[in-house]
């Protein structure tokens, strides 16, 4: 019997309108009535998940959790105070930021407070408007955050080939050595602290709750979800997932994020079990 379902948000749990489809809400509610925990697991900051938690009836719950920053931060849904968190070495963060400035990309610099946006292009404004605590910056270096925690840095481009070229260059010059680097959302290249991934975050939470790995389900769509898809007892990829995510999965959904993929998994493996 599965006791915990962890799901990515964007392009997995959420439809393209950034809301949870009704079928998915009903399936999650039914699973919770059976005592199964539902855990959002996102690359975004925890404070960007509030609307989703409200839609799922999980907001303010002391007994429920959210994994954010690709599993690098664990919070109770009743508090913004992290139970666990990780950070990039500041020197490495400075190198990544400098590369982003040279490349002219839009950058998210995630802290335990605001998300600092460099080169905040119109396409990104439309995409994330109202979902994060944003502070715009034009600073040419990361010195303005000296002494603060930088959780991760994200490069944004609508050209994945552009991001792939940048990542290859950074790998060849050693800037990303030892870091956990992922693509997500078909527009992001994410740089995380060593050992930070959704799989590790999920297994850490399961251990905290006394849940065995084989009793967990993970659902995702992109490269930053692969670690939890592999780590879970049942790893699932939505129909709109990347080939990499589908190859890692035990089960590939017929439905995509708009037609209730998360509900499909819960109905088949939790409610139908």
Where are these regions (language model features)?
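Conserved acidic, metal-coordinating active-site core of Asp-based
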Residues: 99, 103-219
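Active-site phosphate-binding/coordination module
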Residues: 22-124
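Active-site glycine-centered loops adjacent to acidic/histidine catalytic or metal-binding residues
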Residues: 8, 42, 221
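Mg2+-dependent phosphoryl-transfer enzymes with acidic/Ser/Thr/Gly-rich catalytic loops
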Residues: 1-4, 21, 190-273
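Asp-based phosphoryl-transfer active-site loop
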Residues: 2-16
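Short, well-ordered alpha-helical microsegments
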Residues: 46-50, 163, 225-226
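Short, structured coil segments at secondary-structure junctions
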Residues: 56, 62, 70, 177, ...
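Conserved SAM-binding loop
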Residues: 13, 38-41, 66, 155, ...
């Amino acid at each position: 019997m599965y006791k915990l379902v962890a799901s990515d948000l964007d392009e997995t749990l959420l439809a393209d309108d950034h809301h949870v489809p009704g079928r998915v809400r009903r399936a999650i509610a039914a699973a919770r009535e059976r005592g199964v925990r539902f855990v959002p697991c996102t690359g975004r900051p925890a404070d960007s998940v509030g609307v989703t938690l409200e839609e799922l009836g999980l907001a303010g719950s002391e007994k429920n959790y959210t994994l954010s920053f690709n599993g690098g931060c664990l919070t109770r849904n009743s508090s913004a105070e992290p139970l666990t968190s990780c950070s990039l070495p500041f020197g490495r963060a400075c190198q990544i930021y400098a590369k982003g400035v040279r490349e002219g990309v839009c950058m998210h610099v995630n802290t335990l407070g605001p998300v600092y946006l460099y080169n905040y292009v119109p396409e990104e404004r439309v995409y994330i408007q109202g979902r994060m605590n944003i502070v715009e910056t034009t600073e040419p270096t990361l010195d303005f955050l000296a002494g603060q925690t930088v959780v991760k840095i994200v490069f944004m481009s609508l050209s994945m080939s552009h991001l792939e070229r940048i990542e290859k260059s950074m790998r060849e010059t050693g800037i990303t050595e030892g870091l956990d680097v992922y693509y997500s959302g078909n527009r992001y290249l994410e740089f995380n602290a060593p050992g930070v991934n959704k799989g590790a975050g999920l297994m850490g939470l399961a251990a905290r709750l006394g849940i065995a790995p084989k009793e967990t389900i993970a659902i995702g769509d992109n490269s930053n979800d692969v670690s939890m898809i592999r780590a879970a007892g049942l790893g699932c990829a939505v129909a709109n997932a990347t080939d990499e995510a589908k190859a890692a999965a035990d089960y590939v959904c017929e439905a995509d994020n708009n037609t209730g993929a998360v509900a499909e998994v819960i109905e088949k493996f939790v409610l139908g079990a």
